[in-house]
Structure formats: C-alpha cells, structure tokens
C-alpha cells in the first residue's frame, strides 16, 4: 500500500532542515501483521516533533525502530539516525539499587562524567539529590532524573515515549515547561510519542499522526513559544489533529 502524507503547513527551508533522521520505505511486522507500512519520513536536525496515534497504531514501534531497539521484528526499508541517541520512557527505569547520580552516570566514562552528571541534575532541578535513592523520589522527580540521564550523553536525538503519561496534571505541566527549556538550551532533535493532543500542540513545532501504520497527517505548528492552551489559533490546530484521529467534539 502506498504511503500518503497530508502537509497542511510547510516550514520554510533553512539550514536546520538537514535530516537528523531519515526513513525510506520503513516496514515492520509482528506475527504477520504490518504495523509500519512503507513509511517515508525526514526529521530535521534540531526539530521538536510530536507523534500522535491511537493505541496500536505503531507509535512505539516507530520510536523503537529509530532507537535501534527492535532487533527481533520482521522489517525492511532504510533508516538513518544519529550516533548519539537517548530514550526516555514512561517509566523512569531508574535502577533501585543505585543512587540518583549513579543512575544518571550509568554507561558513561571519563574524568568529567561525575561533574557532567551533577550539572545535568541541576538543570532538571535535582541539585542536592545526587545521593538519594530512586524510591525517595516522587514520580515527577524520577522523570527529571531520567531526563538528566539522557542529557548527560549529549544526544543529537532525544526519543521520548509518553514520558509524562503516569504523572498528575500539575506535574505534567511543569514537565512540559522543563522539557521545552531543555530543548531550547541543547537543541537535539526530539521525537515525542504521546496520546495527548494538547501536549503535542503546546510542546512541538511539528505534529505527525500515525494511522494504520502510515503518516496520515503532517502538521507544522507555526506559533511562537511559550504557548498557552487558551490561544484561539491553537484550538484550530487541535480540531485538525482530532479530526485526523477520528475524534469530533460537540461545541455547545
């Protein structure tokens, strides 16, 4: 089946549009069922992209393919990604037998590693918690530590698979602000997988909708940051994305 993409708004070509990630004809199948269907996609260097879709649409499969974590699936196509890739999941995946700083430094080497780890923890608001155990952290603090762990590797590409899905509403808003600030400071390419349309609109500069294993909508959010949920124009983007997801809202 041929891929199809609907581009509602096109960003002007700039030096930053050099692809950090490039997919050509990417296909992935499980038990004879096609989950990703010949996807062609470019993610420019430094772009913040969000990926929406129903459960089972292939969002996490696409992220895992880009991360190189899908060795046991049947697939084809061409995939190019940067060498330095960090992944943040919904579960912080902190090792309970290691202190926070040791978790952040896991897999890193060099004399400056500890200093970089402390700096990363300070960036996410966890200065002074280096010696804490993971079970002493709140859910939001654990995700902050996970972000610090990703930052210390100085990634060219940050993949985030519903990182705030288990957090309460207020903590999610705070984490939205933090993630955007970290992106503006470090400028990695970001691919954020989420079920939350509002989260995608507030954070991302481009939103993709995955539908039956294909990119059904490719929408550039051409609005300055910081953004407010109350902006009327964001409501227009929201309606387009919900329509692409097959959701309609009744307005009184």
What are these regions (language model features)?
Residues 21, 36-38:
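Conserved structural motif at the start of ABC-family nucleotide-binding domains
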Residues 52-54:
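The feature captures the beta-strand-to-loop junction immediately N-terminal to the Walker
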Residues 152-156:
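A short, proline-enriched helix->beta-strand linker immediately N-terminal to the Walker B motif
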């Amino acid at each position: 089946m041929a891929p199809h993409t609907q581009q509602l708004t096109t960003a002007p070509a700039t030096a930053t549009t050099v692809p950090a990630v490039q997919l050509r004809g990417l296909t992935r199948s499980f038990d004879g069922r096609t989950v990703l269907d010949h996807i062609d996609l470019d993610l420019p260097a430094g772009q913040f992209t969000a990926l929406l879709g129903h459960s089972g649409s292939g969002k996490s499969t696409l992220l895992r393919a880009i991360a190189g974590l899908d060795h046991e699936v049947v697939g084809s196509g061409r995939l190019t990604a940067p060498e330095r890739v960090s992944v943040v999941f919904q579960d912080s995946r902190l090792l309970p037998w290691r202190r926070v700083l040791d978790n952040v430094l896991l897999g890193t080497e060099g004399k400056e590693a500890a200093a970089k780890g402390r700096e990363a923890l300070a960036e996410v608001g966890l200065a002074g918690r280096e010696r804490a155990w993971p079970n002493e952290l709140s859910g939001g603090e654990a995700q902050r530590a996970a972000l610090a762990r990703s930052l210390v590797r100085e990634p060219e590409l940050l993949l985030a698979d519903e990182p705030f899905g288990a957090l309460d509403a207020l903590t999610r808003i705070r984490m939205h602000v933090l993630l955007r600030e970290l992106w503006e400071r470090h400028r990695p390419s970001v691919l954020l997988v989420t079920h939350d349309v509002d989260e995608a609109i507030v954070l991302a500069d481009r939103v993709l909708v995955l539908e039956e294993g294909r990119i059904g909508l490719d929408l550039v959010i051409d609005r300055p940051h910081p953004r407010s949920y109350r902006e009327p124009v964001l409501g227009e983007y929201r309606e387009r994305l919900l329509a692409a997801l097959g959701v309609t809202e009744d307005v009184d």
